[in-house]
Curated annotation (Swiss-Prot):
One of its GO terms (cellular component) is iron-sulfur cluster transfer complex. It comes from the Bacteria. Member of gene cluster sufABCDSE that mediates iron-sulfur cluster assembly under oxidative stress and iron limitation conditions. Binds [2Fe-2S] and [4Fe-4S] clusters by mobilizing sulfur atoms provided by the SufS-SufE cysteine desulfurase system and then transfers the assembled Fe-S clusters to target proteins including ferredoxin and aconitase. Seems to act as a Fe-S cluster carrier rather than a scaffold, this role being performed by SufB and SufC. Changing residue 116 to S: Strong decrease of sulfur binding activity. Homodimer. Interacts with SufB and SufC. Belongs to the HesB/IscA family. [2Fe-2S] cluster binds at residues 50, 114, 116. This is Iron-sulfur cluster assembly protein SufA. InterPro entries: Fe-S_cluster_asmbl/transfer (IPR050322), FeS_biogenesis (IPR000361), FeS_cluster_insertion (IPR016092), FeS_cluster_insertion_CS (IPR017870), HesB-like_dom_sf (IPR035903), SufA_proteobacteria (IPR011298). GO terms for biological process: iron-sulfur cluster assembly; response to oxidative stress. It comes from Escherichia coli (strain K12). The keyword Cytoplasm does not apply. Disruption phenotype: Deletion has only a mild effect on cell growth. However, deletion of both IscA and SufA results in a severe growth phenotype in minimal medium under aerobic growth conditions.
Amino acid sequence: MDMHSGTFNPQDFAWQGLTLTPAAAIHIRELVAKQPGMVGVRLGVKQTGCAGFGYVLDSVSEPDKDDLLFEHDGAKLFVPLQAMPFIDGTEVDFVREGLNQIFKFHNPKAQNECGCGESFGV
């Protein structure tokens, strides 16, 4: 499915939603506390990489009219409606890998991922 063309009716879908682990919720709350005016984080997808799609995280000061809100322990995760067919059911985690701390996405719709982990296919 091309994200830039075609239409879908949200009423045709039974969304599972997205979930935040406690670690992801804590990190989002910390980000919001550090940036005046920020209310949460937006998770979207874009066409990129060798597998087709990549995750995009942005700070949110004002939600877009088509954003869906998923909240856990005061942490707000906004998702553009058009991204839901690609990431519905995803669990968002925040983990330490060696010296790095990163968001990890456990997406049941991801059929394949590239070797570097930067993109996925559905």
